[in-house]
Amino acid sequence: MAEEITKSYLKKKQYSTTRYLEARIKIHQFTKNKHSFHEWILNNFNLSLFEKDKTIKILDIGCGTGVFWKKNSKTLNQYQIDATLTDFTEAMVEKEKENTKEVSANKTFEIADVENLEKYRGQFDIVMCHNVLYHAQDKKKA
């Protein structure tokens, strides 16, 4: 019988290492889109609305392995950014640190649950939360 997908399951089985997420990310290499998934996300932020000499505060909820930041480092490094990068497990946060070394942003790394983010409310110019909400058991809380 299949194990129920709970937070405990996700933490212990799916995201205790980064390999399963990294395998899913590799699927995108077969896309025929002009831009990668991560470039597409960045293009939809419309960073041109922000002045390059002003700090942009970004919260990345469920940052995963930090591949968004790694793939977009050249563009992101043109801006002054204070980034709070969060994920559900320590394994992901450790990989985020490794993958975001090229990004010049002032980075803070935290373990955080998508359903318990009250402390971040109202502090950011941009809040990212891609490919995360389907993990939340209580979607309204998330």
Residue locations for each model-derived region?
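Conserved class I S-adenosyl-L-methionine
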Residues: 2-53, 67-68
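Conserved donor sugar-nucleotide recognition element shared by glycan-biosynthetic enzymes
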Residues: 34-38, 89, 139
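A conserved beta-strand element that flanks and buttresses the S-adenosyl-L-methionine
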Residues: 128
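Class I SAM-dependent methyltransferase SAM/SAH-binding core
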Residues: 59-116
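Short catalytic micro-motifs in class I SAM-dependent methyltransferases
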Residues: 131-132
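A short, conserved alpha-helix within the catalytic core of class I
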Residues: 136-142
